[in-house]
Amino acid sequence: MSLFSLWVMAFGLSMDAFAVSICKGLAMEKFQWCGALKAGLYFGLFQAVMPLIGFLLGVQFSEYITDYDHWVAFFLLALIGVNMLRESLSDEDDEDSCSNDFNFKTMMTLGFATSIDALAVGVTFAFLSVDIYSSVVTIGLITAALSIIGVKSGHFLGKKIKTKAEILGGLILIGLGVKILMEHTLFG
């Protein structure tokens, strides 16, 4: 996977955390850097650890599905992307994600919930030529930075950004899935 593709994937994966961070910022009466840094730490750490776990699981099963790995990568990324689009267009809103509470339990729950997609992407990494350690660091750092920016911008800009971020993230992941499939079927 090229560095550009990795950055695009990291950006796409970080959109759930970014959207929740915007909600956190919206709930703040007064902006607090401590809350923004906590969001960056929790979301960045979860987004880094989950693909590593997914990668390790994928490596365990890669010998059984090597002939179909590009299809697995495509379907996982497309499924995640479509789910992100569906969630962004629904009227449902998660009250916990939009509270101004940055306690351990809340942030652990949100960190896990926003990184499930990263676990599935980690499985796809097992089938691609990916330096897993630099990949998870890149994903974690980009997510941390965007989460901090999300809290800050949510505090100042309002609700309009949240849905657009989720739509963009979903489209990016679907696009990457199509790219992987095309590379292996048309050009591979």
Swiss-Prot record:
UniProt main location, coarse: membrane
| S-S pairs | none
Task: Kindly indicate whether the keyword Manganese belongs to this entry.
Answer: yes
Residue stretches spanning the membrane: 3-23, 39-59, 65-85, 110-130, 131-151, 167-187
Keywords of the record, alphabetical order, are:
Cell inner membrane, Cell membrane, Ion transport, Manganese, Membrane, Transmembrane, Transmembrane helix, Transport
A GO cellular component term found in this entry reads:
plasma membrane
Q: Which Pfam families match?
A: Mntp (PF02659)
GO molecular function, a single term = manganese ion transmembrane transporter activity
Q: Where in the cell is it found?
A: Cell inner membrane
Membrane topology note: Multi-pass membrane protein
| PANTHER family assigned | MANGANESE EFFLUX PUMP MNTP-RELATED (PTHR35529:SF1)
Question: What role does it play?
Answer: Probably functions as a manganese efflux pump.
- Family, per entry: Belongs to the MntP (TC 9.B.29) family.
Its recorded name reads Putative manganese efflux pump MntP
Organism of derivation: Mannheimia succiniciproducens (strain KCTC 0769BP / MBEL55E)
